């Protein structure tokens, strides 16, 4: 059944659902997967908008089943296993298998699409042939119990892409939730040296405006306490140096130090909620209030920037 936004359902407050709502409202015809396990309070909206969701607790899947019956809809679920990253997912794999059987045999409106795993997020655990091989073995046990093949064995996100490129992704993994490597293609190269030369790593460009240019000391003058966020900072005394302040801050990109200036001879000193401070002493460019400065982004800064109400987004076709 093709899903369109139900006009009787309020616009969602969850950013993930807001994005899906906007895509459906724009007429995008596709199957949508909710990447975060659903909030019980949003089940009605989720069932109305989303084709498939990641799940890790049977009680929530029962809520989905009841809501699907009420709306006369079908919904697919992927049960998540925790293979050490300690974010979402079943730690007790036997319980996971038993819950999969319950979904398969007792929920007529919910289809068990498959199982999946998350790695490289909270616990910083790398995807490996071992932990993804464990996922495949769990999938086979589920299949034995339900008497059919699972459509999806989802082996993680962009961090698993390196194994795919190397031909080391375990047989049986047939699904990856790729986003960052398609949008940006930076982090795997920057962190692990993965050759991504066949992808463009300069797709998103952040532009910010200079609001002040002065020569100032590099070490704060006065009694040093904590910064605006309650953190103690380390400062390096390099004497008087030329610097620029830009109208951009943590509220826009989260991690100022992860911004990548596209201008040579420029480094990031730091900033605050709505200010970014650059060292421009070694730059050969002309600097003045009103100058527009370009930055490349990594996953973290891209995630914040695309969700910031203070940043306008322009889509260009080449």
Where are these regions (language model features)?
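Active-site anion/phosphate-binding pocket segments in diverse small-molecule metabolic enzymes
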Residues: 11, 18, 133-318
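Active-site-proximal beta-alpha core segment in soluble small-molecule metabolic enzymes
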Residues: 1-130, 137, 145-146
């Amino acid at each position: 059944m093709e899903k369109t936004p139900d006009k009787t359902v309020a616009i969602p407050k969850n950013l993930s659902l807001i994005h899906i709502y906007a895509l459906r409202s724009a007429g995008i015809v596709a199957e949508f997967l909710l990447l975060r396990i659903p909030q019980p309070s949003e089940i009605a909206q989720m069932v109305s908008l989303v084709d498939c969701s990641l799940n890790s607790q049977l009680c929530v899947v029962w809520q989905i089943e009841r809501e699907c019956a009420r709306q006369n809809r079908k919904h697919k679920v992927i049960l998540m296993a925790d293979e050490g990253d300690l974010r979402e997912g079943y730690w007790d794999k036997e319980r996971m298998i038993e819950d999969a059987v319950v979904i398969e045999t007792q929920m007529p409106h919910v289809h068990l699409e498959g199982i999946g795993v998350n790695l490289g997020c909270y616990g910083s655990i790398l995807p490996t042939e071992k932990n993804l091989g464990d996922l495949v073995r769990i999938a086979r046990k589920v299949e034995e119990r339900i008497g059919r093949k699972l459509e999806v064995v989802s082996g993680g996100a962009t961090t698993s892409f390196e194994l795919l490129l190397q031909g080391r992704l375990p047989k049986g993994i047939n699904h990856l939730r790729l986003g960052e490597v398609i949008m940006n293609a930076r982090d795997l190269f920057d962190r692990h040296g993965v050759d991504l030369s066949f992808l463009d790593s300069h797709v998103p460009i952040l532009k910010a405006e200079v609001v002040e240019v002065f020569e100032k000391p590099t070490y704060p003058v006065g009694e040093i306490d904590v910064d605006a966020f309650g953190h103690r900072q380390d400062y390096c005394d390099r004497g008087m140096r030329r610097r620029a302040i830009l109208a951009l801050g943590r509220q826009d990109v989260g991690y100022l130090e992860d911004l990548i200036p596209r201008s040579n001879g420029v480094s990031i000193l730091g900033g605050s909620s709505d200010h970014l401070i650059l060292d421009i002493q070694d730059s050969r460019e002309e600097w003045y209030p009103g100058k527009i400065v370009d930055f490349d982004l990594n996953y973290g800064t891209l995630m914040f920037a695309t969700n910031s109400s203070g940043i306008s987004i322009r889509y260009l076709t080449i």
